[in-house]
């Protein structure tokens, strides 16, 4: 079996409605994958542009004995739906999706998060959203790689 088929076969689908007004609450299928060791410390891996969660194939394999790993492909990327035009792709919409996956789908309360490239911008925005929740749902550790956004996480 090739890497792509193996990655796809290990995934599931979650449904997401865009929260960007211009997208008219259009629902999309989002590819989600959980791998590693259930019950081990949770690790959320967030992909960059123009890639997908499969970028983490080798890393997930290396870390699978030490972590319970959670990943998704943002809409328009990888194995998730490619919404038709005039869909607006938004860092904030992707951050809301990430928060939804962490808190509602995966139900993580203690986790680490590693982000890359555009995923770091999404991760920083999500961090602000997670910090505003009651109780806050921020990661224990956050590792940003190629981060380009600067978002305040302190109360105004």
Language-model features, listed with the residues they occupy:
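Alpha/beta-hydrolase fold catalytic core
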Residues: 1-43, 64-67, 89, 106-107
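Active-site loop/oxyanion-hole signature of alpha/beta-hydrolase fold enzymes
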Residues: 19-28, 33, 74-114, 128, ...
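Conserved HGGG/HGGXW glycine-rich cap/lid loop of the alpha/beta-hydrolase fold
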Residues: 31-79
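Short, hydrophobic alpha-helix immediately C-terminal to the catalytic nucleophile
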Residues: 57, 99, 124-128, 145
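Residues at the starts of beta-strands that form the adenosine-phosphate
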Residues: 68, 110, 138-141
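Gly/Ala-rich beta-loop-alpha elbow adjacent to hydrolase catalytic centers
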Residues: 115, 119, 123
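Flexible "cap/lid" loop of the alpha/beta hydrolase fold
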Residues: 127-156
């Amino acid at each position: 079996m090739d890497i792509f088929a193996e990655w796809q076969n290990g995934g599931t689908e979650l449904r997401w409605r865009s929260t960007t007004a211009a997208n008219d609450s259009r629902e999309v299928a989002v590819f989600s994958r959980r791998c590693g060791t259930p019950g081990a410390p949770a690790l959320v891996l967030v992909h960059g542009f123009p890639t997908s969660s499969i970028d983490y194939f080798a890393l997930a394999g290396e870390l699978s004995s030490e972590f319970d790993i959670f990943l998704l492909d943002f809409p328009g990327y990888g194995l998730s739906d490619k919404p038709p035009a005039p869909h607006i792709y938004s860092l904030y919409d992707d951050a809301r999706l990430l928060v939804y996956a962490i808190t509602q789908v995966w139900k993580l309360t203690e986790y680490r998060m590693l982000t890359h490239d555009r995923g770091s911008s999404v991760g920083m925005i999500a961090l602000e959203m997670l910090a505003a929740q009651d109780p806050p749902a921020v990661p224990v550790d956050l590792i940003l790689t190629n981060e380009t956004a600067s978002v305040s996480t302190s109360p105004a």
